[in-house]
């Protein structure tokens, strides 16, 4: 096999690959064996015609497609490995020469991983995040706990106020006609939460139990349902109950009820410790992010658009999966947000480009600094994963493919490199 490599444009190479006749003949024979049952040749039962007869009857071109796929795929893989080429997309294949008793010649044009020009990366200056927890932070968090443990109690001696929970029946009408999804019974609506259409909740303030209320609202122009967008609507509402939050008494008994501690002081001390741990973790993440951005900002790399597009694809798939866990799908989300798929993808572009650059720059530093995952690193990572999934380590190992192990090694090297950069950074 002969290979010529030419840089045809920025981050794009073209390989001219020549495969000898014998190798192409092997591909033709494999194509014949794969397709022989598809050919009808007079005088032969289907699938029994010899190859030379099929080629004479249909022309040898009838076997070219699969032969090309078989031969070109193997030749291309060998060529990029031998020439240390790192493609980031599928190649564009063009046949230059093909025929009986001829070497197969084809070109493969492909986008490759770009070269990274590193700037300063060891000892970079970055803003230091502090892990401070104030008394005010503690009180705010404690108040959330108290609110969470509040109970709703009915009130009958006053009208609805902001912050109350109103239990209502309602039915919506547009032009005096009920519309789908506009009806509910025994619905608990927190007044002032903004859960319903703008203006709906405000019109219930001052109303009493058993009141029938006509609520007039306008759906937003981009509400998410075409039949409701911008429409005027009337809701017939019955006030069935008014509830208010009753906060628990904050004392040692409260601490005992919600925790393993006997006193309120012990509970608050534990809460402060947890807040401090959380603040410390956040500060570490923020410091890491500051260092990474400083390092990446000092580097130069011309990122191929295809790498950004692929990363956007992955981000969109991940977003869609998270939506499905919440009982939504991407199409419904786009309707609610009043956008289309292209607009949705575009919102990821800047972040995707930044994340691709981070990946490329850190990979380059790993290579320059000879940062690698050791066997012990890989073993530890596999053990952690097995424990997380409550699976025996040896069973998990059996499921790992070579590419899975390669991914684990690369990920470990990536994280080790970032740690080196952070440890050597000047945080101030």
UniProtKB/Swiss-Prot annotation:
The keyword Isomerase applies. Its main location: cytoplasm. InterPro entries: PPIase_dom_sf, PPIase_FKBP_dom, Trig_fac, Trigger_fac_C, Trigger_fac_C_sf, Trigger_fac_ribosome-bd_bac, Trigger_fac_ribosome-bd_sf, Trigger_fact/SurA_dom_sf. Belongs to the FKBP-type PPIase family. Tig subfamily. HAMAP family: Trigger_factor_Tig. Consists of 3 domains; the N-terminus binds the ribosome, the middle domain has PPIase activity, while the C-terminus has intrinsic chaperone activity on its own. This is Trigger factor.
